[in-house]
Amino acid sequence: MLSSPLRVAVVCVSNINRSMEAHSILRRKGLSVRSFGTESHVRLPGRRPNHPVVYDFATTYKEMYNDLLRKDRECYTHNGILHILGRNERIKPGPERFQECTEFFDVIFTCEERVYDTVVEDLCSREQQTFQPVHVINMDIKDTLEGAILGAFLICEICQCLQQSDDMEDSLEELLLQMEEKAGKSFLHTVCFY
């Protein structure tokens, strides 16, 4: 069993759906978790396809919720966005960008390949300070309510297995292979250093 709690980050594009669903589940399981997005702005589905509602990352979940409630309560209730923002508000005040975080993690999960690329690029561009390893794992998670829940449970299972292992470095590769087989999809994995 690991001597200290596993420090986990989950990163998606806007820190709204996939990363926050995982944040919610991991937190309920008692894990040390933070969640982030990587884009320059938060984009939510709008009333029409290809016309997202765009917010700055400094906008709180409550402000987004109230804005969408005023704009079209029925639409944003029907598509689940108000539910998601309500859940998010109970977890933390607002979305955060990974590139602005200075905290160190043991494992960072990303929810799609372009987010993985951004996270790895950001970590590699930072000046190394402690040479502490951080495992960056990508699992493509569909950006739907159901996809986010399924992805969050898979991330949770991996974290619980890692938390129980005697040596995370030795057991991670084998664990990822087992989880890939179970999930029916492959993961990207690399190690970066702080």
From Swiss-Prot:
Disulfide pattern: none
GO CC aspect terms: mRNA cleavage and polyadenylation specificity factor complex
Annotated TM spans: none
Protein's UniProt keywords contain Transit peptide: no
Enzyme class, spelled out: hydrolase
Compartmental location: Nucleus
Keywords: Hydrolase, mRNA processing, Nucleus, Protein phosphatase
Protein's recorded name: RNA polymerase II subunit A C-terminal domain phosphatase SSU72 like protein 6
Native species: Homo sapiens
